[in-house]
Design a protein with these regions (language model features):
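Short helix-coil boundary/hinge micro-motifs
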Residues: 1-137
C-alpha cells in the first residue's frame, strides 16, 4: 500500500481538498493557456502542487490521462454549479479517478484512511485528487 499523501517536492505543503481541486481546474484559462498542456509543463506543476516527487515523472499516456481527468473534473464542477446532471462527465471522472487504485486501510486503533494500492507515481497523483474529491463533496 502506498500512503496517499504525496511527498512535497518543495517547502510547500501538498495541496489538499478544495485547494487542490481549484488549483487543478484553474490550470487551463479561458484564453486557452494550459499549464498542463505538455508533459514538460505538467511535471513541474505537479511537483509544485506537492503531488509528484522530484525523482518521478509521468509518461505521455499518463499525461493524456491527467488532461482527461482535469477536463472531466471541470465538466462535473460546471454541471454541479448549474444544477444540471451530466452523466457523461461523471462517468468520465469516475473512470479517470479509478487510476488512483484506492483502498481503505484500518489502523490498529480502528481509524480508517484511504491509500493507493499502486506504486506508480501517477496512480498516487490520481489517488490524491480522488481523495480531494471525496473530501470536498
Amino acid at each position: 500500500m502506498t500512503d496517499h499523501s504525496p511527498a512535497a517536492a518543495s517547502d510547500n505543503a501538498p495541496l489538499r481538498g478544495h485547494a487542490l481541486l481549484d488549483s487543478l481546474t484553474a490550470t487551463v484559462a479561458a484564453d486557452g493557456t494550459d499549464l498542463l498542456g505538455t508533459r514538460e509543463e505538467a511535471v513541474p506543476w505537479l511537483r509544485r502542487a506537492g503531488l509528484l516527487p522530484d525523482d518521478a515523472a509521468i509518461s505521455n499516456s499518463e499525461h493524456g490521462a491527467l488532461l482527461r481527468l482535469r477536463d472531466a473534473l471541470r465538466d462535473v464542477l460546471a454541471a454541479r454549479a448549474s444544477g444540471a446532471a451530466d452523466p457523461d462527465a461523471t462517468a468520465r471522472l469516475t473512470r479517470a479517478l479509478a487510476d488512483g487504485r484506492l483502498v481503505v486501510t484500518v489502523s490498529p486503533a480502528g481509524a480508517a484512511a484511504l491509500a493507493s494500492s499502486a506504486r506508480a507515481s501517477y496512480s498516487n497523483v490520481v489517488a490524491a485528487i480522488a481523495i480531494a474529491v471525496a473530501q470536498a463533496w
